[in-house]
Amino acid sequence: MSILNKVLSKIIGSRNDRFIKVLYKTVDKITELESKMQALSDEQLKSKTQEFKDRINNKETLDSILVEAFAVIRETSTRVLDLRHHDVQLIGGMVLNDGNIAEMGTGEGKTLVATLPAYLNALSGKGVHIVTVNDYLATRDAQWMGKVFDFLGMSVGVIVSNMAHEDKQSAYLCDIAYATNNELGFDYLRDNMAFTSEQKVQRILNFAIVDEVDSILIDEARTPLIISGPVDDYAQIYQTINHMIPNFTKQIENGEGKEIVIEVAGDYTVDEKHKQVFLTDDGHGKAEHLLIDAEALPEGVSLYDASNILLMQHINSALRAHILFQKDVDYIVQDDEVVIVDEFTGRTMPGRRWSEGLHQAIEAKEGVSIKKENQTLASITFQNYFRLYTTLSGMTGTADTEAVEFQDIYGLETLVVPPNKPSARADKSDKIYLTTQEKFEAIAFDVANCQQIGQPVLVGTSSIENSELISTLLEKNNIKHEVLNAKQHEREAIIIANAGSIGAVTIATNMAGRGTDIVLGGKLSEEATDKQKVDWKIQHDDVIKAGGLHIVGTERNESRRVDNQLRGRAARQGDVGSTRFYLSLEDNLMRIFASKKMASMMQKLGMEKGEAIEHKMVNRAIENAQRKVEGMNYDARKHLLEYDDVASDQRKVIYQLRDDLMSVSDVQDRFISIRVKVIEQFFADYISAELMEEDWDVEGLHNALKLDYSADFPLKQWLDEGIDIDELQLRIIQGLSTICDHKEKIVGTKPMREFEKSVMLQTLDHYWKEHLAAMDYLRKSVNLRGYVQKNPTQEYKHESFAMFTSMLDTINIEIVKSLSSVTINENTNVSDVEQENNEGVQVQHEEVETLGVNDAELEIAKQNKFQKRKKKVGRNDPCSCGSGKKYKKCHG
């Protein structure tokens, strides 16, 4: 900040100060209503909810009733919980209601603050999600604050892991739902794998209040939620079919076009021009026989039955792998991997993979490990999930240091809400030692002194390993203590709640116990007797006399925010307290950024073993090092988001397609439209008005129609009638329509429509899953292009768009193939169509690396100004699938 800005800030206040000053005017209005609310009976107070809903239905806005609604919540909380919202809590509620981040210190009552915007926004009937970091906090807060909402006639749900499907659906329908961030994200992905609308649990993502917003939207931004499915069966199928292929023989043919003569009958023909292989009738029979022998196909079942659609695709991929793709020409085998060779440059393309099962088929052929690229069924980052909400807000004790990132990526402004009482915390200068052992011994000495005078101590560590090392040292010194980590949420909350007792010593990893206040004197039970309350008051006063809670940091973290979170555990709500960090030159941060200068300084000072440096200048140097690391981490997260935003845009298109399919009972019109489009393109590959008639590949068209669509049309006979190619194309389309109509007559209209929908959804899911795998490989390999002066991000966007449009075309083609070629008779049960069901599905929160981002790429990321997310696609905007059509005419 410049000197002029500092002077102006002192005179007129900072932007934050001015904003808070404006909100205080609204606080005064809420307070003016307090006596009026106090005069209401319980029934009159409860009736306010319906009154507000009626006013909203009569076109009043939520903002217009904010003052009254906040006054109602304040009075209800006072009556039900004996907790009255302080003025600063009302300000925090308004900050959240405006879709911003409220930074409020530990102990300022953020849980109570959330009731204000939650109640107001739930009046719209669209639902509010209050997001916490674990199941324990979600359940605790729902039970605790739920009493307020229940009094006012608002339904409250809790969404945690391992819930029954019906219970989860009910929870999402509640006015206000407390949920964990993980479960919300996984439910979103699971909903978009459902086959019926009734299977979905979430409704519109309306208003979210994210507690510990820095932890969820910053710390976990690089850890996507992933749903993966079983793949072992697919690997076995590829192996089984691979062993079958040598049994097939090529059909020998002579001549071209109309003059083809079969010299030696065989099991398949080859179309090298289009890089396709077609099974003959003999080949179909042999394939079925071999599959039955291998117990991959039940006896008496046709390969073209509804349940075997994917099996036929595997056979086709295996034939192409053996017949059309050659080792050391199309690909090489290197380090147990099949690596594609670019047909134009002759260079290998590490990380790239063929789709539609071809790459796995080649891996099976070459005897290398069959990669599980289809393992990921669905994936999303928290960054892109939470940006789906109409309004997003958050609260934490430490957000200001990440304000730029919140603004750039989420469009959220961070406002620091003043404390209810001025802080009395004493932040002591860091102590820096030469070695870790000296540091730990100094910590043990400090802890022992505090325990001796009855001052409670919280020792914060960066890892479970360090927690155990310090615990061992304290045990050797006979210092009684508790150790907790982030594994058992319920136990940690109990220990943290009592960490403020006289002489208590608690060792905790930095994140353990967040969300639970440390009360000086220990937590007082709600059922406490008068005597217990008196005893607690005595202990509370004794702890204050001893100096309040003392925080010991065992090392500086890479982020100042994490250090501030630890400091914030002390001196809640105006209590006394103190903090000190102990460092050594062997700590990671010091070793990387400050060790040489600091070690030189220590040597010049002639420091003895066990001595420490303690100076504000040292603190500033460490904070500068932290700023460097924070900047690097921010650049990496921003860079990764540019990649993920591409997948996010594509994900929205696919999920919208799924929703469109599930929302209608009759998809026939959509199928007919797809069929016409596919056949027109398919037809043009063989016969075109731009070609001379003798160059038409009528035989190839006939064979392809027979193989892919089970349609044996007399194309030559039709052409001999003198029809033009437009009429020929029309007859093919009509012929395929007749085939489908015949199948419908066999099974009935309703079952056929359900079958069509199932096949369309299944095909969409199958190729989307393959596309996700291909995108993942592309993202891992594209960074190498930075070395040849190409922007990897732009390369990724360009290629992924081409892959996406190709996938959409493939989906349409496969839908038409499947529905045209499937065998249906009187005994067929069309509900048996193989679906990509969710049996064996696993959810995981997977840690990802920075994708090998190098310095050059980070520089590119800095130069290319990062754009905030776009608004939702309007119905008249161009569709993001690249069709060139308006969204409403394409995927809208």
UniProtKB/Swiss-Prot annotation:
Q: Which domain of life is it from?
A: Bacteria
What protein is this chain from? Protein translocase subunit SecA
Q: Does the keyword Translocase apply?
A: yes
User: So what EC number does this one have?
Assistant: 7.4.2.8
- Which coarse location class describes where this protein primarily resides? membrane
Q: Which organism is it from?
A: Ruthia magnifica subsp. Calyptogena magnifica
Q: Which UniProt keywords apply?
A: ATP-binding, Cell inner membrane, Cell membrane, Cytoplasm, Membrane, Metal-binding, Nucleotide-binding, Protein transport, Translocase, Translocation, Transport, Zinc
Q: Which residues bind Zn(2+)?
A: 879, 881, 890-891
Similarity field: Belongs to the SecA family.
What is this protein for, i.e. what is its function? Part of the Sec protein translocase complex. Interacts with the SecYEG preprotein conducting channel. Has a central role in coupling the hydrolysis of ATP to the transfer of proteins into and across the cell membrane, serving as an ATP-driven molecular motor driving the stepwise translocation of polypeptide chains across the membrane.
